[in-house]
Amino acid sequence: MFLIVVPLFLVILVGYCYGRTKPDSGNADKLINDYVLYIALPALLFIAVARADTSDLKQWGFMLSTLIGIAVSYMLAALLAKRVGIGLPHSSLLSMGASYGTTGYMGVPILISVYGEQAALPAAIATILHNIPAIMAVIVSWDVFSTRAIGANTRLIHSVGRSALTTVKNPLTIAVLAGLAFVLLDIQVPVVIESFARFLGNAAGPTALFALGLGLARLKVKEHLNVTVSKIVLPIVVLKLVIQPAVTFAIAVYVFGMDGYQGVWLATAVVMAAQPIGAGVYVFAKKYHYQPDVIALSIIISLLLALVTIPAVLSLFPPS
C-alpha cells in the first residue's frame, strides 16, 4: 500500500518544489487550478456518475455514514469553539475546518489510483456530500448572525437560498448533477462524449495533486505559527484527520453493516473523511475576515500529517 501511495505524494512534492522555485508564477497557478476545478475533475465525475446504474446510487449506508461523520466533527468543533469563547458565526469557520476536506483535489485521485475505476462513482458522490453541508452552514451562519436586517425569517430563507445556489454553482456539483440526469432519464452517454470526458478526466488526478503542491508552496507556516493559534489548530486537525474518519467507519460498519462486499464504498467513505482540511475553508476565512492565519496553519499541518495518516487509513482497506 505504501508503494502505491508514494507516487501520489511525490506529485504533490513536485508541485510544491515547482511553486517554491517559481515564486512569480501566480497566473500559471491560477490557470492550473482552474483547469482542475472547471474542466478535468468535472469531466471525471460526470462520466463516473453518468455511466452508473440506478441501483448503484442506492448506497444509503454509505451516504448516511458520510453525513453523520461530517455532522459529528462539525458539532464537536462548534463545542470546542464555544469552550474558548468563540460563538456564531465565527465558530462556523472552525467547524468547517474540522469537517471539510480536499475531497476533489486529493481524495478522488488517490481513490482512483488505489482502487481503480470502480472507486470513481463513490468518490463522486462523496465529493458532493462533503461539499454541500459545510459550505451551506458557513454561508447561512454568517448571513443570519452577522447582519441586523429586519425580519429574521426572511433573512434565513434568503440565506439558505443563496447558500444552496452557491453550492449548486460549484463545477463539481454541476458535473455530478449532470451525470445523475443521464442516469435517472436512462440516457445512454454518446460514445464521443464519453471518450472526450474520459480523455479529460484522465488528467484530473496528477494535475489536481500538482496543483495541491503549488498551493502548499504559497502558504507560509512561520507567518501564522504562534502558541495561541496552535491551541485552536491542533484540536481541529485531530477532529478532521482522526475523529471524522473514525466516526464514519464506526457508523458504516456497526450501524449500517457495511462490510467486505461493499469494500470500495466503505473504503471511499473512510478515506474521504480522512482527507486533510480543504483550501475552501481559507477562502471563506479571507472572505469574512476572520482568523485566516488559524485556517492557513490548520491546512498546512493537516496536509503534512496526512502524508502519514492517509496511507495508514488505506492500509485498512487493501485493494482486492
Please annotate each region the language model reported.
Residues 1-320:
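Alpha-helical transmembrane segments of multi-pass small-molecule/ion transporters
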